[in-house]
């Protein structure tokens, strides 16, 4: 399993880091078989797995439940778990309690938090307690209400400068990596050059130290539309719908199950059920 040290070395050597979300045992198992460097159990599960309109309703219990399943499916892959909405904006003591629960109960190797400002002290607090933290800047889904929706961040000089400053503060606070979401590729490149920790981009161009995508977006599974920055490498959704539709048709027309899908008993045993009268 790769560790923080390996990821730093990969950045130094210019080897891109691959990160993919996973939310359950089978998706984690497949991600590990595909040799993904890092798995993110994102609170995006609220939207792509639980059917919410945003990540806001996701709870600490949800994150623990899904991370435990991912851990069972990917025993040899570094796992990062999101701290969900408002689980780290309370007191530092409550933040630590939530962080401890996620790490101890789920087996996550690191936690991810969104934003800067007061979150910087949270990164430092968790780091000092021995919990590795991945920072997340740019478009932060838990704050879409404040940001005015799912929009590209850092497009003007003033906001770009703020993102650069925040990125440096995240690193100084002890973050082991930084996710940059929906920022101009030129800005992402500048930030990557000025940090020693790896940057993982999602909608941040190619000049970052790694990439992350949502599992369901990448394989077109249960999604109707995807963001501009997503490349769909395959479409399992069409095959799944086709297979289920065929199953429904065959059941309705009594084509399934066939004899080869059924179990039998000896004729004398069948007759014995009725005392030999049938």
Curated annotation (Swiss-Prot):
CDD domains: KPHMT-like. Its EC number is 2.1.2.11. It is found in: Cytoplasm. GO terms for molecular function: 3-methyl-2-oxobutanoate hydroxymethyltransferase activity; magnesium ion binding. One of its GO terms (cellular component) is cytoplasm. GO terms for biological process: pantothenate biosynthetic process. Binds 1 Mg(2+) ion per subunit. It catalyses: 3-methyl-2-oxobutanoate + (6R)-5,10-methylene-5,6,7,8-tetrahydrofolate + H2O = 2-dehydropantoate + (6S)-5,6,7,8-tetrahydrofolate. It comes from the Bacteria. 3-methyl-2-oxobutanoate binds at residues 43-44, 82, 112. Transmembrane segments: none annotated. InterPro entries: Pantoate_hydroxy_MeTrfase, Pyrv/PenolPyrv_kinase-like_dom, Pyrv_kinase-like_dom_sf. Its cofactor is Mg(2+). Mg(2+) binds at residues 43, 82, 114. The active site is at residue 181. Gene3D superfamilies: Phosphoenolpyruvate-binding domains (3.20.20.60). Homodecamer; pentamer of dimers. Belongs to the PanB family. HAMAP family: PanB (MF_00156). Catalyzes the reversible reaction in which hydroxymethyl group from 5,10-methylenetetrahydrofolate is transferred onto alpha-ketoisovalerate to form ketopantoate. This is 3-methyl-2-oxobutanoate hydroxymethyltransferase. The gene is panB.
